[in-house]
Amino acid sequence: MRYKIKNVIVESVKYILDPVVKGKKDFVPCDFRRNKILAGFAHGITGIVYAIAKAVKSINDLQKPEILQILNKLLKEENSLFDSEKMFWIDNRGEERKEALTTWCSGAMGILLGREEINKLNIGIVADKIKETREIVLNNAYILDYGNSLCHGCIGNLMLLKHLSSYDKKLLGIIEKMVKHLEKDYLKYGMQTGYKYNNPSLSFFLGIPGEIYGLIYLYYDENLPMILL
């Protein structure tokens, strides 16, 4: 069974990278807009490269120079969505390119997480823009208008900051500020979901269950699995 599962993983990696291998595209099509390159962990290139990098680390059949070359190429292509003058990642999902929120799913927070973890694997993939993305997080992680969800809210960002602080202690500086904001928010409004216009969602990543999980992680049990990685 293990051998069969290994083959499934290898074939899946080939399927994902096929457009680049055959020269049809310079990037891997993502969800939402299959004709566009997207940045991010949940919806973009960083998440795709991270998953494949973990597979390369574990499976000998995938430990090939050409695969590493493609993964490095994909990260460089994702860098095209970084505005170095205005210092933000671009959200390319809509009709117009706009500044991405500093969130896990499609913004700087998830990109920083993914790229730090990719480099930690030490398999020949170089994920850059770490310093710039960390700066964005330091300046903007607490500026959120979409509730407290894991996906793109305050709880998710706090969990990530706590995890990423092992890489950079400066990130601890904004955790206290965000916790005070969060506590004030809960006392005033109670649970809020991950939508701009609050809905009583019961989904894990967008709704109340994920908020409960995050609060337990932050206040009671930091040994809970880091569900966003």
Q: Which residues are covered by each model-predicted region?
A:
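Solenoidal tandem-repeat scaffolds enriched in leucines and small polar residues
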Residues: 1-59
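Terminal, non-catalytic domain-edge segments
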Residues: 54, 58, 117-121, 125, ...
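Acidic, glycine-rich loop-and-beta core segments that form the ion-binding/anion-interacting portion
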Residues: 46-103, 108, 114
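Intrinsically disordered, low-complexity segments enriched in Gly and acidic/Ser/Thr residues
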Residues: 138-152, 161-174
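Well-ordered alpha-helical segments within folded domains of soluble proteins
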Residues: 1, 37-54, 99-117, 148-163, ...
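Short coil/turn connectors between adjacent alpha-helices in alpha-solenoid helical repeat scaffolds
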Residues: 1-4, 58-65, 121-125, 166-170
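Long, well-ordered core segments of solenoidal/helical folds
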Residues: 7-28, 68-88, 125-145, 173-191
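Active-site-adjacent structural elements in folded domains
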Residues: 31-36, 92-99, 140-145, 195-198
